[in-house]
Amino acid sequence: MSDSSSSSENAPATPESPGRPPRGIKSYVLRAGRMTAAQSRGLEEVWPRLGLSVAEGRQSLEALFGRRAPCVVEVGFGMGQSLVEQAAANPETDFIGIEVHAPGVGKLLDEADKRGLTNLRVYRDDALEVLDKCLPESSLTGLQLFFPDPWPKKKHHKRRIVQPAFVELVRTRLAPHGYLHMATDWEAYAEHMVEVMEEAPGYRNTAPPESAPYVPRPEFRPLTKFESRGERLGHGVWDLIYARVE
């Protein structure tokens, strides 16, 4: 029961761009999907207003949204349900979604337009490219990674997005005290996340002692249909929130 995440995976940083994972291994597989009329409308009519591209390069968040406000990025938003809910509930915060799958991007754009949201922008690009080339350093209030592909087979673990180089790249984009919030329904992946984060410099775990290393699901993370179905089936969900300390 895991959503797919839009980001490539990582290994050691390259000399040309310290802290940036190389592009070779991807944490996602692009699959052809049928588009509904609403999804197509989102891509065709709403994209020119809310869509962004790596080709546009680095821009200030103030330039993207026309104001200065806290900004949260979600990597791999799937069909966009939780991201739209958060943007609608928090008009004082700006949100950037990153997703490679066209149906999800189209669905998000259609819903954002129907709700009249102005605090949401979308990249249909590899998340590592966006983080590295587009988002300013020390600029983000938070980054969300909800239910990334767990790649459960051992031979595929290298495809998991949560790797040392990835979390270091995220750290450089977070403002001081900004947070990295991850959620997964695969306990083994949750344990992997903890292992990576506990070794990562410049982070601290925000979990209370009674539930550490995990945090109870925060109220600000919407409960999606996907997660609700999992709960009915008895699946667990593990949330982790780490804050940048420098």
Swiss-Prot record:
EC number: 2.1.1.33
Primary enzyme class: transferase
InterPro entries: SAM-dependent_MTases_sf, tRNA_(Gua-N-7)_MeTrfase_Trmb, tRNA_methyltr_TrmB_bact
Catalytic activity: guanosine(46) in tRNA + S-adenosyl-L-methionine = N(7)-methylguanosine(46) in tRNA + S-adenosyl-L-homocysteine
SUPFAM superfamilies referenced in this protein's UniProt entry, alphabetically: S-adenosyl-L-methionine-dependent methyltransferases
Binding site for substrate: 153, 185, 224-227
Region called Disordered, residue ranges: 1-26
Active-site residues, as the UniProt record annotates them: 149
Single annotated GO MF: tRNA (guanine(46)-N7)-methyltransferase activity
Gene Ontology CC: one annotated term: tRNA methyltransferase complex
Pathway(s) the chain acts in: tRNA modification; N(7)-methylguanine-tRNA biosynthesis
Keywords from the UniProt entry: Methyltransferase, S-adenosyl-L-methionine, Transferase, tRNA processing
Binding site for S-adenosyl-L-methionine: 74, 99, 126, 149
Record's function text: Catalyzes the formation of N(7)-methylguanine at position 46 (m7G46) in tRNA.
Family: Belongs to the class I-like SAM-binding methyltransferase superfamily. TrmB family.
Entry protein name: tRNA (guanine-N(7)-)-methyltransferase
Organism: Chromohalobacter salexigens (strain ATCC BAA-138 / DSM 3043 / CIP 106854 / NCIMB 13768 / 1H11)
